[in-house]
């Protein structure tokens, strides 16, 4: 967060009229600090988090109708929730309501899961069998927009009690070794490209190019973005970073009002909203005890107070070289 504050001051000084598109995580905390330091910043956040369910639904449409060529963008949605933990309460294709179709799939595959590539989740933390999505939908009546691992991380330990529990839901945790391998692979690819290898043609993992094109006057775009809540999600705290659709056009980003989350989904979300607020307050007041309280209040926290205190101290010790700001 101190780095975000530094970026914010530099943007205000060098290019105050620029549009800033944040892809950094944690999305909500980064955006909150950026706006706190430079309130007039033209800021929005975007990621590929919400692609997971739309891609699943596009596949379902093709399978159920016996057609091909339905893309993620062909699935129209109403999106609402906090950044990183958003939901769809409306999904359509060509004007047809797809919620009944989704319910049929959820009921049929709630136990076995619905897999594109059998057992891929065992080696790829970004793959899953959609069992968590189906379970949350059948219990809460609303579709998680994110992949199963991400959705599970925002819930109590229903799905994440241990690796055996996660495996039973057919998803895997994100491990340090996996992240290191991905980083190493990407670093090797970048070096090859810098040495003259031709860049491959590939589909971008976010809609950033389309967003930039729309902001520059290249046509209107509806895209999922993160923005401070100004009423677009009625029953989430004012100012918290929320994720909804937005109409993006020349020099303009206008959030689409998503409405209200069902109370059960809102209850899961509000806890995270206030925890994120506490983490930012810890930065502002340079008080790591405030962050500790947010750590204790995370839904996946199952440790007793003594064990949690020891774990927190161990975490701080491991990253102490990055915490000099809090010692000033």
Name each region found by the language model.
Residues 65-328:
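Long, compositionally biased stretches enriched for glycine and/or charged residues
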Residues 28-31, 53, 231-234:
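Flexible loop/turn segments at secondary-structure boundaries
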Residues 20-24, 45-46, 79, 224:
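A structural signal for short, well-ordered beta-strand segments and their strand-loop junctions
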Residues 32-36, 56-58, 89-91:
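Short acidic, glycine/serine/threonine-rich loops at helix termini
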Residues 18, 41-42, 75:
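A structural micro-motif
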């Amino acid at each position: 967060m101190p780095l975000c504050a530094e970026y914010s001051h530099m943007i205000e000084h060098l290019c105050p009229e620029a549009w800033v598109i944040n892809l950094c995580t944690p999305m909500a905390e980064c955006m909150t600090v950026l706006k706190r330091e430079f309130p007039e910043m033209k800021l929005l956040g975007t990621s590929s988090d919400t692609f997971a369910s739309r891609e699943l639904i596009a596949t379902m449409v093709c399978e159920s109708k016996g057609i091909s060529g339905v893309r993620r963008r062909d699935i129209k949605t109403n999106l609402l929730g906090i950044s990183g933990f958003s939901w769809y309460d409306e999904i359509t294709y060509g004007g047809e309501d797809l919620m009944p179709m989704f319910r049929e799939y959820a009921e049929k595959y709630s136990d076995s899961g619905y897999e594109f590539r059998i057992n891929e989740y065992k080696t790829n933390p970004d793959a899953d069998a959609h069992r968590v999505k189906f379970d949350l939908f059948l219990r809460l009546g609303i579709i998680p927009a994110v992949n199963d691992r991400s959705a599970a991380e925002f819930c109590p330990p229903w799905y994440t009690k241990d690796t055996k529990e996660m495996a039973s839901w057919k998803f895997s945790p994100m491990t340090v070794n996996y992240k290191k391998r991905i980083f190493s692979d990407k670093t090797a690819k970048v070096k090859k490209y810098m040495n003259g290898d031709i860049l491959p043609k590939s589909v971008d993992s976010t809609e950033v190019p389309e967003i930039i094109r729309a902001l520059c006057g290249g046509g209107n775009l509806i895209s999922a973005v993160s923005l401070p809540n100004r009423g677009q999600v009625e029953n989430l705290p004012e100012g918290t970073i929320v994720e909804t659709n937005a109409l993006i056009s020349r020099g303009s980003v206008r959030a689409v009002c998503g409405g209200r989350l069902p109370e059960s989904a809102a209850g899961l979300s509000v806890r995270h909203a206030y925890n994120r607020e506490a983490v930012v307050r810890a930065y502002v007041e340079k008080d790591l005890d405030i962050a500790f309280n947010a750590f204790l209040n995370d839904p996946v926290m199952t440790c007793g107070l003594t064990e949690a205190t020891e774990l927190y101290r161990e975490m701080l010790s491991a990253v102490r070289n990055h915490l000099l700001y809090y010692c000033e």
